[in-house]
């Protein structure tokens, strides 16, 4: 990554900090356990609906692939985040605590997803400066074996990815 591009990307990410927090809190309030992330997957796909990218379902689970500059020659880089919650009761009084009894985000997948959504948005904004393509991988069911990754890999999530 050249220093100028990196600086622009970091500035954009800084400019979107409040959006990252808002997305993370929404996701934290609406966790779903592995292989039942239907609403989360819909939320993720809806986020991309007005952005200049190609979105598709991936795997026989709720996996999502987002391609930026899919036909541009050069390396294909990938970023990945998981988005399932855990079957744990959240016991606190935070204004954004889980609204789903017995399910919570206890290990950061809400944050991973929020950050990846905004990273993708910023990369789309800078897409003309990218020498190649970007693949964004939203993986469900990371908390159980074999999880959603295997299904996504079999359905081509990593096909053509260089790094």
Predicted segment positions?
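Membrane-interface loop-to-helix entry segments
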Residues: 107-109
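Acidic/histidine-rich catalytic neighborhood of metal-dependent amide-processing enzymes
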Residues: 111-163
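Acidic/His- and Gly-rich active-site-bordering loop/insert found
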Residues: 2-105, 114-117, 121-131
């Amino acid at each position: 990554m050249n220093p100028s591009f990196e600086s622009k990307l970091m500035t954009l990410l800084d400019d979107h900090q409040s959006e990252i927090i808002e997305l993370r809190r929404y996701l934290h309030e609406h966790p779903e356990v592995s292989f039942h992330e239907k609403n989360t997957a819909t939320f993720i796909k809806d986020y991309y609906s007005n952005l200049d990218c190609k979105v598709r379902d991936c795997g026989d689970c709720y996996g999502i692939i987002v391609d930026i500059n899919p036909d541009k020659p050069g390396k294909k880089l990938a970023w990945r985040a998981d988005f399932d919650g855990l079957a744990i009761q959240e016991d606190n009084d935070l204004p954004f605590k889980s609204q789903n009894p017995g399910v919570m985000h206890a290990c950061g997948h809400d944050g991973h997803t929020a950050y990846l959504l905004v990273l993708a948005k910023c990369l789309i904004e800078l897409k003309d400066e990218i020498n190649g393509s970007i693949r964004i991988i939203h993986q469900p069911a990371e908390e159980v074996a074999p999880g959603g990754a295997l299904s996504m890999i079999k359905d081509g999530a990593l096909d053509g990815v260089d790094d």
